[in-house]
From Swiss-Prot:
Superkingdom classification of source: Bacteria
Induction: Negatively regulated by H-NS. Positively regulated by IHF and EcpR.
Protein's name in the database: Probable outer membrane usher protein EcpC
SUPFAM superfamilies: Carboxypeptidase regulatory domain-like
Signal peptide, first to last residue: 1-29
One Pfam family here: TcfC
Amino acid sequence: MPLRRFSPGLKAQFAFGMVFLFVQPDASAADISAQQIGGVIIPQAFSQALQDGMSVPLYIHLAGSQGRQDDQRIGSAFIWLDDGQLRIRKIQLEESEDNASVSEQTRQQLMALANAPFNEALTIPLTDNAQLDLSLRQLLLQLVVKREALGTVLRSRSEDIGQSSVNTLSSNLSYNFGIYNNQLRNGGSNTSSYLSLNNVTALREHHVVLDGSLYGIGSGQQDSELYKAMYERDFAGHRFAGGTLDTWNLQSLGPMTAISAGKIYGLSWGNQASSTIFDSSQSATPVIAFLPAAGEVHLTRDGRLLSVQNFTMGNHEVDTRGLPYGIYDVEVEVIVNGRVISKRTQRVNKLFSRGRGVGAPLAWQVWGGSFHMDRWSENGKKTRPAKESWLAGASTSGSLSTLSWAATGYGYDNQAVGETRLTLPLGGAINVNLQNMLASDSSWSSIGSISATLPGGFSSLWVNQEKTRIGNQLRRSDADNRAIGGTLNLNSLWSKLGTFSISYNDDRRYNSHYYTADYYQNVYSGTFGSLGLRAGIQRYNNGDSNANTGKYIALDLSLPLGNWFSAGMTHQNGYTMANLSARKQFDEGTIRTVGANLSRAISGDTGDDKTLSGGAYAQFDARYASGTLNVNSAADGYVNTNLTANGSVGWQGKNIAASGRTDGNAGVIFNTGLEDDGQISAKINGRIFPLNGKRNYLPLSPYGRYEVELQNSKNSLDSYDIVSGRKSHLTLYPGNVAVIEPEVKQMVTVSGRIRAEDGTLLANARINNHIGRTRTDENGEFVMDVDKKYPTIDFRYSGNKTCEVALELNQARGAVWVGDVVCSGLSSWAAVTQTGEENES
């Protein structure tokens, strides 16, 4: 039956007829044309409305609950009267994160309802644990459920970031420049430099990446290299990429250790996508709480309260993002109306995991193309020429309970290779990692590592081993090494002790050994700073050479306001040196860190080495570049100087701006229009960034959602009124550069005394400016906010006559007293008041 809109007349009849729904008249009073449904007399007008059909709200109600205060709306139902029989035509469910959820069986029963009739009690049974009850008196439908019919409101483990907020062509260019000079002892020198550029140009979710470097700029040995030229679209959980890139930039889900150096021209496709965000901070085993009514859930561990969360009626997964990592038990306490309803113990399973996290769906990727293999050499003994080959492969990764795994199968140069990686946490203290490779030319590799936290939490231990045997085709070297190490936190045994670390590395292929032992202790920590003690020993040998032993001991003094000082001694190469180091950090300004170090031999034979060496460095953060300048004179007599600088440029249409930051290859250009050194702040996802001058560029990480809010800076005396563009919500993909152009007014609070041309005071006069008005007091004094772009005050009198005050506010900031000012155009205030002319006063 087609839906019909109620006519105005029918609506009036319906409203009149509703009066009868709340009264149970006796038979003698009932209208002869009315009928009775479920014990309620239905007037003719309302009966006609039911025959046309109407929508009523659907609420979920827990069986046994008193009243409807905890009922939740979960949708709507369309009911109609068919030949005296009330029916449900369809149910429309409305999903909400805060609402209770029904079980899948109950959901299917609801969605399958079509022209289902109500019985005489106005009820439709669905399952043994759920039924629909219609109240004609309140015109609402209740889904009455037992606890068994409730589903569980689980927290989403993944979310697509959605469409890009930037619909026009834009680009981000990151640059990294370096230059270094070596002065030799004999007076010679050499200088070299490089410039690395990474450009990402995008249109919405489509982007092209160009990555390359220039070497030896300004010298006779200039060179250039293009590392990547690739088109990419990563959207809605799938990623496609095509172009050229070197093997160092090859993206794969699984390990690919047998790929030799070279360049690949090919394509890849899969669901390993950054546009889908996986939340791995929740417990792999959901913590579930049932609430019979709205209330609180308390999580407690070892008597310590970890979290308090509020929920409505139903089964809910508790948010465990803020809980500590590990595997442990928590006590889940449900409190309703101040009373403890239930208490039970559940297990939290939160482990650090690679990739998309525990519980994420299977990830896959296929790729292939042409492979240019670079010339390869192993210690000059075994060489292979450059070669062209094909390349094809597939990668996949996933998890099973706490086990995370990844696998890759690929082929090139007529060789087939398979690789796997497994990560398995055992309890909360042990973590096992295994990585294996097997190739068709009999090459194989096995890498294993175990890390453990020993009982008591005061010590940890790790063991690594790698063994590789290469056949006659793969361009890779054999390996046979092992390492073991650990850390002992003695502070947990006695507060005056520190931390002791030891490690041993053994490379059996090259017959080299390496031992280290380090100790650190905090000697003092208080108002005046902190003092730490460092000591250690290193011993290594390489092949048949004699063992080389180095020792050091140092005191590190950290002072307030970013000051740091260290003094100590080292013994190496047969002589002992005294070392001094100092560092100063700054919160503001272009120079952020300066430091220096000085070393002098105090005993032993230095041989050809100098007895005095040292250096200095500075880290800078300027508007268009940030980096480090370093000068160092080594013991061997060489003087090394190097400068590195990096930054970013963002572009969209006619807007272009630069920054010394390199936070990502997306960003935002702020066209604030601030004059001189004016400053406001941008609050982006809770972080505060300063904005100076007319235009700023702020690089941001791609594949992210950002909430941007402009506000006054706490470090500036200026006050600004951000009229429009204060808040923005952005979704940025690689290469997306958004432009925010707020309307900003620089405000100055002006106070003074206003006079007419003859010097009389404008007492109790209403004066105006560009953004507001105020009234002077009996002495002609005023206080008002003025927009610096419109530094005028005017006063109207005698109808259309005005006088005006021109304020000099170019150097004014915050608040200013302007003293006596003259309202030009008003000869005398006394004349205005004596004539009684109508004015704004």
